[in-house]
Amino acid sequence: MMKANFIVVEGLEGAGKSTAIKTVLDTLKAAGIENIVNTREPGGTPLAEKMRGLVKEEHEGEDLKDMTELLLLYAARVQLVENVIKPALANDQWVVGDRHDLSSQAYQGGGRQIDASLMKNLRDTTLGEFKPAFTLYMDIDPRVGLERARGRGELDRIEKMDISFFERTRERYLELANADDSIVIINAEQSIEDVAQDIKAALNKWLAAQ
C-alpha cells in the first residue's frame, strides 16, 4: 500500500488554490485514497490561526515589520507541522495543504527581498528535512490574480501590496519550482476545466510513480 504523503497547492492571490485543492481531493479519492487531512497556512491549529490573524490584518497605528511577519509565519508553520501534519502522516493519513514553506520563500524571500541565506537558515532550523512530497504551483499573472481577488471582496494586508511585490513573488516561485522536480507548474490562467484537467494529469502521473 502507498504510504501517506503531504501534498501542497501554492500560488499567488486569485490563482484558484481553493478550486485546485478540491480537484486534488477528488483525484486522490478517485485513486482510492480516502483518509485525508486538510490544512492551510498560516493557520491550521488554534494558536496558528491567531498568528494568521496577526499577519493578515491591518494594525492601526503600528506597522508590522517584515521580520516580524516572517517569524510569525514560521512560528505558525512549526505549530502546524508538529501538531497536525506529522502526526497525521504517522497515522497513515494523507495531508493536503493550502500553502506551505514555498510561500515564505516566494513572498518573504522574493516579494519582501529578505536575505536568501537567512531564509534558508530559518527553514532548515525550523523544518529540518521536512518538506511536501508533491507541490502544485498555480501560476498566474499578478494583475489577473489580483483582479480576481478584488472580485471576491475586500483585500487583506498582504493583498494590498503593490504590483512589483507580487511580480517579485511570482519570479521567485517560478525560480524555485523550476529547480525542484517535486513541484509542478500549472497554468492557472486557463479555463477552470483545463486547469482541473492539468492538475488531475500531473497528480495521477505522480501517484503512478509512487
Swiss-Prot record:
EC number: 2.7.4.9
Binding site for ATP: G11, L12, E13, G14, A15, G16, K17, S18
Lineage, broadest ranks: Bacteria, Pseudomonadati, Pseudomonadota, Gammaproteobacteria, Vibrionales
Species this protein is from: Vibrio campbellii (strain ATCC BAA-1116)
PROSITE patterns xrefs: THYMIDYLATE_KINASE (PS01331)
Catalytic activity: dTMP + ATP = dTDP + ADP
The UniProt record lists the keyword Protein transport: no
Annotated GO MF terms: ATP binding; dTMP kinase activity
Gene that produces this protein: tmk
Keywords: ATP-binding, Kinase, Nucleotide biosynthesis, Nucleotide-binding, Transferase
Role: Phosphorylation of dTMP to form dTDP in both de novo and salvage pathways of dTTP synthesis.
Family note: Belongs to the thymidylate kinase family.
Record-linked InterPro entries: P-loop_NTPase (IPR027417), Thymidylate_kin-like_dom (IPR039430), Thymidylate_kin_CS (IPR018095), Thymidylate_kinase (IPR018094)
Stored Pfam families: Thymidylate_kin
GO cellular component: cytosol
Protein name, per record: Thymidylate kinase
Example of a GO biological process term: dUDP biosynthetic process
